[in-house]
Each structure stands twice: as C-alpha cells, then as structure tokens.
C-alpha cells in the first residue's frame, strides 16, 4: 500500500525566512510557489531526491494548517507516501475503519491525523522534478 516517502510538509511561521534557510543550508531550490484558499495556506515546493519538501505558512488561523501552528508551533505536518493504487488503498483503509478523505477521481487521499498518532498521512502518485 505505501511506497517511498515522497513529500514532507513543514508548517512555518515565515515562509520567506524558511525558504532562505532551506536553500542556504541544503542547496535546495524552489520549484513552485502557490496558495490554497481552500486549505488556508501559502506554500513553496523544494524538490529533493525522489520527492519534495513543502513549506506551508498558514493564511487562515481557522483552517487545519493554522490550527496546527497555533497548537504545535512549527514542525512536520504531513508525510506523503507514493501509492500506485489510491482507490484500492482507500477502500482497504475504510474497510478497517480508518477515516480517509478521498475525492472521487483524484490521485490523492489523506488519512486523518487522529488515525495515526497525530501524523497527517497523504497517499499520492509520485511527482517527478526532472
């Protein structure tokens, strides 16, 4: 069901400072910057070997990322695993009583943090940054 770790999302207070730190310390480059009004954050994607680090700065304190920052401070928010059969994996998890958010027809799903000791787990097809 789970393949390689392909995403590590880190919640930060100041995305500009975090970008500077990750690029200076690790030699990473920003591949994409964006904003999700639906989920209440701005982000930056920094490709790594087989996946990427995603920096998330909340824009809405009432959405999940904002609540995470208020409760936990900065830190790891989500781990994304490569998954070749998302619909099948979602079905198996739901059969086991696991709360999973999957939108029909999308190649991504999320396991609720309460199911796995507070860690937000994402199932996704691997993105390549060549």
Protein language model features and the residues they cover:
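Vicinal oxygen chelate
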Residues: 1, 44-47, 54, 90-130
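N-terminal beta-strand motif that seeds the catalytic metal site of vicinal oxygen chelate
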Residues: 1-19, 74-81, 129-130
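Short strand-coil-strand connectors
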Residues: 13, 47-49
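Amphipathic alpha-helical segments
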Residues: 14-29, 89-96
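Short glycine/proline-centered loop/turn elements that form peptide/ligand docking sites
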Residues: 17, 35-39
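Conserved secondary-structure micro-motifs at functional edges
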Residues: 25, 55-63
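A short, acidic/glycine-rich surface segment
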Residues: 31-33, 62-67
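Mid-chain, well-packed structural core segment of small domains
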Residues: 64-93
